[in-house]
Amino acid sequence: MPKICTFLGISIYMYFDEHNPPHFHALYNDFRGKFLLPSLNYTAGNLPPRIIGLVIEWAELHKEELLDNWNRIKETGKYKKINPLV
């Protein structure tokens, strides 16, 4: 599972064997969350509201890169790191 970014203690992952629709996972301490692409809807998890907001803020800035990584991982298993929020 590639870690594509880390910022403010939040790690962003995309898994190689995941199903559609496109999405990514955020981990923060013992909390986890799943966000859909391109809508950025938070669909599952137990992340604190403040962390959800930070993840969405970051993802809005990098939506195209996230979608590109989703396609790359599915097609080739390769991905690119994405810059952090700060």
Task: Map each language-model feature to its residues.
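Basic nucleic-acid-binding interfaces
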Residues: 1-86
